[in-house]
Amino acid sequence: MRALRDRAGLLLCVLLLAALLEAALGLPVKKPRLRGPRPGSLTRLAEVSASPDPRPLKEEEEAPLLPRTHLQAEPHQHGCWTVTEPAAMTPGNATPPRTPEVTPLRLELQKLPGLANTTLSTPNPDTQASASPDPRPLREEEEARLLPRTHLQAELHQHGCWTVTEPAALTPGNATPPRTQEVTPLLLELQKLPELVHATLSTPNPDNQVTIKVVEDPQAEVSIDLLAEPSNPPPQDTLSWLPALWSFLWGDYKGEEKDRAPGEKGEEKEEDEDYPSEDIEGEDQEDKEEDEEEQALWFNGTTDNWDQGWLAPGDWVFKDSVSYDYEPQKEWSPWSPCSGNCSTGKQQRTRPCGYGCTATETRTCDLPSCPGTEDKDTLGLPSEEWKLLARNATDMHDQDVDSCEKWLNCKSDFLIKYLSQMLRDLPSCPCAYPLEAMDSPVSLQDEHQGRSFRWRDASGPRERLDIYQPTARFCLRSMLSGESSTLAAQHCCYDEDSRLLTRGKGAGMPNLISTDFSPKLHFKFDTTPWILCKGDWSRLHAVLPPNNGRACTDNPLEEEYLAQLQEAKEY
């Protein structure tokens, strides 16, 4: 009987301990049978509750309507957890998650890998977590499930339990902004997991796309346009001035040889006796060929006659004396027959200049005058006037003749006409130097002409301001355009204070030939007179006075100007 009492007491103690354990932990002693998963499927956590009133069936039916359910650990009235694994579903075809066997939550969670020492499962590293002490209404929870990518939220409810929600992928139509993150114990617990040591809980959405739109700089486009100018060809009569200017300055040197006296030829022969005749003939032949090529190059252009139209900026760079082609240049072909029957025509010759390249040279040929045009040439200039210009140009190089005075007193109707047209169409000099012109060409409005003109800086080392404009610090030169009626350009110079020099040795003069067209022709037409006059700017200014069309203040002052004038006379 005593053994029976001991056994009964032991049984009562076991029952008492089981009751106390059930009351203390709130864990089920018996596993209720629920609609379990299909045999052989993966075990999934479902809603688990130890309370006598389980979750309503209506809520379980609404859960499959979500495009992607949330992993939720939600305590109910008796401090229990509700865990739901995310199910990948499409709207309209959702299936309810499978419910595994009901077991104690703590034992099931500890069986998961990586959660031996934690109370939560390993979250998605792309999720975000936030916690708030206030409970959220059921309606707000349902709306949160409709987010395109909700945050991993752990919210404390009435009985101190947590609700854990995994991000759900929905359509972007019902997106709402994510809630602000807060530092909570849950975040600290998540960061302790080995898989999340180096992970960022606020990792941005990897599905985001970044579009980079390249916007072209308008300033770069302007710079390109500046290099491409001039885009419009000027009137045809602009280039028609050039042949007459060439003839005016240099003339035809053949007439000089015919006018020499027999004694002069004899003196040359005596001087040549000291050298072999073969060397002299070879040098004369080379000089003759160079003169013919140069004359044909300047007078007729590198590709065709001047009548072919405007030359592109790249064509304005004439041949350099230094050749960078290491292959020996081939000989020119014979000149082609003259293209005309009377008056003037054209001749061409060619030579290979490389693979697929042929250089062409053109020159004019003189033919008997056509009937009715004996007294006029193609430019409308009398033939006698051509001879007079040639004779004047020849006399300029005579040591016994004052070349400067000869040039200044040249009474040519053609030159007068050209100068008149040039001075009438050129823009007026700005009273102040535009500093932006040092970097790129500028456009300035000219009130007298009623349109804008392009100007470029002319203060570079090649301009040699220290020689030709010694008191100038800056210079400007107008650019040719489609509206230019001549090949001339306005030249303006300024002092150190960027003020226009209206007189004196530093003032600029209008240029007969613009450097935009040809720097070499500009030197021969505009710089050569300065050399012939031996730097006496006062004599040159008498023919081509510096421009002051905007009535700028006289610069330099009267006293300094008179001192410069006296210096020029004595020099």
Curated annotation (Swiss-Prot):
UniProt biased composition (Basic and acidic residues): 257-268
Superkingdom as given in the UniProt entry: Eukaryota
Glycosylation site list: 117, 300, 392
Signal peptide from the UniProt entry: 1-26
Keywords per UniProt: Disulfide bond, Glycoprotein, Secreted, Signal
Cellular component GO terms, alphabetical: extracellular region
SS bond list: 338-365, 342-370, 353-357
Domain AMOP, residue spans: 396-559
InterPro entries noted in UniProt: AMOP_dom, Angio_Inhib/Adhesion_GPCR, TSP1_rpt, TSP1_rpt_sf
SMART domains reported for this sequence: AMOP, TSP1
Keyword set includes Signal: yes
Residues in TSP type-1 domain copies: 327-371
Tissue expression summary: Expressed at high levels in the placenta and at moderate levels in the pancreas, kidney, heart, liver, lung, brain and skeletal muscle.
Positions with biased composition (Acidic residues): 269-294
Biased composition (Polar residues): 116-131
Main location, first listed in the record: secreted
Localization per record: Secreted
Presence of keyword Transmembrane: no
UniProt record similarity statement: Belongs to the isthmin family.
Xref: PANTHER family: ISTHMIN-2 (PTHR10239:SF28)
Name of the protein in question: Isthmin-2
Protein's organism: Homo sapiens (Human)
